[in-house]
Curated annotation (Swiss-Prot):
Organism placement in taxonomy: Bacteria, Pseudomonadati, Pseudomonadota, Gammaproteobacteria, Enterobacterales
Gene transcribed to yield this protein: dmlA
Cofactor, free-text remark: Binds 1 Mg(2+) or Mn(2+) ion per subunit.
Gene Ontology CC annotations of this record: cytoplasm
Organism expressing this protein natively: Escherichia coli (strain K12)
EC numbers on record: 1.1.1.83
Protein name: D-malate dehydrogenase [decarboxylating]
PROSITE patterns per the UniProt record, alphabetical: IDH_IMDH
Purpose of the protein: Catalyzes the NAD(+)-dependent oxidative decarboxylation of D-malate into pyruvate. Is essential for aerobic growth on D-malate as the sole carbon source. But is not required for anaerobic D-malate utilization, although DmlA is expressed and active in those conditions. Appears to be not able to use L-tartrate as a substrate for dehydrogenation instead of D-malate.
Gene ablation phenotype (knockout): Deletion of dmlA inhibits aerobic growth on D-malate but does not impair slow anaerobic growth on D-malate.
């Protein structure tokens, strides 16, 4: 008997509450079309509204509750008028990433037909690559502190942490991803000419890992010139792997090069499936447009397609669903309907309706 995939749906804040239901609707249409079963259970916490009533972002047993699910489908978090961003983020998404060991942040970068590219002369097909970001260690640690605070002798120290286990596992994932793609090409982001300890170590581990993948063509590029080449020569990239900080920068720069960050998805993966992985749109909660029913649901729908691909773990039905949703997204982006951010006048549900109809036709 086919397993029903159990998914925790967390709308969060702002437009997350508008786009996530539309994503669920599209995923259920895909399940109907390609013959598998999904069940969704909505969680009302991991939101600033929950914080305003309870003084915390999530209940004490959040880990136990979410561990029962195969995946987490997330909307957006943040309402800075009532809760500072560092509280809402560290109290929800960053907890998920670290305590569920979601050490891979995966961001597809793809130029769709119908989206004007800000880079001169680039066409659909020219930009199609992945950014693989280390998601749990590196430059984003809480180690450090201040001394002589508030005086002219104040000193602030922020430590980076790179472990053999942490570096090797993100590199292994990136090389495996590159091996699965036709071009079999990998670029590693570094800055070993400036960060004299951590980045030479990173480079050493890349070189050591590459020995296990002789068919992969790889290189390393310093982060400054790599950013420039994202803009000037995006067609040269296939899989780009980076530490937490560099990956954070590149994973926003990449989608910006395709014309909009607003339709970009993100996956926070625990590849071993010991814990549930999380799938979300890159955009935030957008308080300025919440309630107007004009939020673009495409990033959430694309994130849902990534979730199906991951949950299927090679199952052809899930791969077909992923590809079918992407084809439907491409058709809607090219021909409409479009929300105002893409120079249209459609509502959030109207875009999802169109994608569902394409999937089910």
């Amino acid at each position: 008997m086919m397993k029903t995939m159990r998914i925790a749906a967390i709308p969060g804040d702002g437009i997350g509450k508008e786009v996530l239901p539309e994503g669920i609707r599209v995923l259920q249409a895909a399940a109907e079309r390609w013959g598998f079963a999904l069940s969704f259970e909505q969680m009302e916490w991991a939101s600033c509204e929950y914080y305003s009533h309870h003084g915390k972002m999530m209940p004490d047993d959040w880990h136990e509750q979410l561990s029962r699910f195969d995946a987490i489908y997330f909307g957006a978090v943040g309402w800075p008028d009532t809760v500072p961003d560092h509280i809402s983020l560290w109290g929800s998404l960053l907890k998920f990433r670290r305590e569920f060991d979601q050490y891979v942040n995966l961001r597809p970068v793809r130029l769709f037909p119908g989206v004007p590219c800000p880079l001169a002369g680039k066409q659909p097909g020219d930009i199609d690559f992945y950014v693989v970001r280390e998601n749990t260690e590196g430059e984003y640690s809480s180690l450090g502190g201040r001394v002589n605070e508030g005086t002219e002798h104040e000193v602030v120290i922020q430590e980076s942490v790179f472990t053999r286990r942490g570096v090797d596992r993100i590199l292994r994932y990136a090389f495996e991803l590159a091996q699965s793609r036709p071009r079999k090409t990998l670029t590693s982001a570094t800055k070993s000419n400036g960060l004299a300890i951590s980045m030479p170590y990173w480079d050493e581990r890349v070189e050591a890992m590459a020995e296990n993948y002789p068919e992969i063509r790889w290189d390393k590029q310093h982060i400054d010139i790599l950013c420039a080449r994202f803009v000037m020569q995006p067609e040269r990239f296939d899989v780009v792997v980076a530490s937490n900080l560099f990956g954070d920068i590149l994973s926003d720069l990449g989608p910006a090069c395709t014309g909009t960050i607003g339709i970009a998805p993100s996956a926070n993966l625990n590849p071993e499936r010991t814990f549930p992985s999380l799938f979300e749109p890159v955009h935030g909660s957008a308080p300025d447009i919440y309630g107007k029913n004009i939020a673009n649901p495409i990033a959430t729908i694309w994130a849902g397609a990534m979730m199906l691909d991951f949950l299927g773990n090679g199952d052809e039905r899930f791969q077909q669903a992923h590809n079918g949703i992407l084809a439907a997204i491409e058709e809607v982006i090219a021909h409409g309907p479009k929300t105002p951010d893409m120079k249209g006048n459609a509502t959030t549900p109207q875009v999802a309706d169109a994608i569902c109809k394409i999937i089910l036709r």
